[in-house]
Amino acid sequence: MMDLQRTQSLLLLLVLTLLGLGLVQPSYGQDRMYQRFLRQHVDPQATGGNDNYCNVMMQRRKMTSVQCKRFNTFIHEDIWNIRGICSTTNILCKNGQMNCHEGVVKVTDCRETGNSKAPNCRYRARTSTRRVVIACEGDPEVPVHFDR
């Protein structure tokens, strides 16, 4: 009888440990994706810029190391305003998932000129206030991917 209780206790402990590990993993992955989103797309201090802004920021944010990232958008809003987009109505993402949200923000779109080589990539800048779509995950939801 004692061995059965001991076995059940160990089994319960194992299940709880595995469950705990399962809960930790997604939040770590989500945080990594959130940090990547911040690095690649958020620049709240700037109001946008010219071609030189894109050239400097793309290099500074490590998107020109191996090859030139062809297109990137920097959002010029406070992170809390961007996170607020995650509380809007869910819409369909390009990948078919329903975890995207849209909002209107100030942006700089950086498009690679097509005739540069990494790490000295060259970009054309276009600033505007426009609709963006971002994917959000977690509880509370945070932006993890720039969809369009």
Swiss-Prot record:
DUMP binds at R36, H41, K69, N72, T73, F146. SUPFAM superfamilies: RNase A-like (SSF54076). Disulfide bonds join C54-C110, C68-C121, C86-C136, C93-C100. It comes from the Eukaryota. CDD domains: RNase_A_canonical. The active site is at H41, H145. Keywords: Antibiotic, Antimicrobial, Disulfide bond, Endonuclease, Hydrolase, Nuclease, Pyrrolidone carboxylic acid, Secreted, Signal. It is an enzyme of class 3 (hydrolase). InterPro entries: RNaseA, RNaseA-like_dom_sf, RNaseA_AS, RNaseA_domain. One of its GO terms (molecular function) is endonuclease activity. PROSITE patterns: RNASE_PANCREATIC. Belongs to the pancreatic ribonuclease family. Cleaves preferentially after uridine bases. Has antimicrobial activity against uropathogenic E.coli (UPEC). Probably contributes to urinary tract sterility. This is Ribonuclease 4.
